[in-house]
Amino acid sequence: MSKKVLILSGSPRKGGNSDILCNEFARGAQEAGNEVEKIRVASKKVHPCSACYYCRDHGGACVHNDDMAEILQKMIDADVLVLASPVYFYSIDAQLKAVIDRTVARWLEVKNKEFYYIVTMADTDESSADTTLACFRGYAEC
């Protein structure tokens, strides 16, 4: 059965390692018969969450007028979410973290999907990715 796969490439570098792996994931998912869309988060305008809770009182609408409403709707509509980030100081890059934070008002519509993670880093010690993976897992299991 075909699934809607949304890949969020958090890397600020187009053609960087994370972005290349996103393209390979997309290719494999398409070859398996799935509908795939990849969004390069760095190419979108996404303000960080202000924690003003406007969204809580306005049906999930955000005070920021940017590309996040479109991204969030695609996240809600997807069956599978792929989150990709380079490891920056043992965590997710700022671009993808802003997207994650901005899902707060409609999180119940995002959770309970299949999640996959693509993590890249320059460090040869695999444990350096542990905190980043914990952030991703915490988000998915919230």
PLM regions: where:
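Short, glycine-/small-residue-rich phosphate/pyrophosphate-handling segment
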Residues: W107-C142
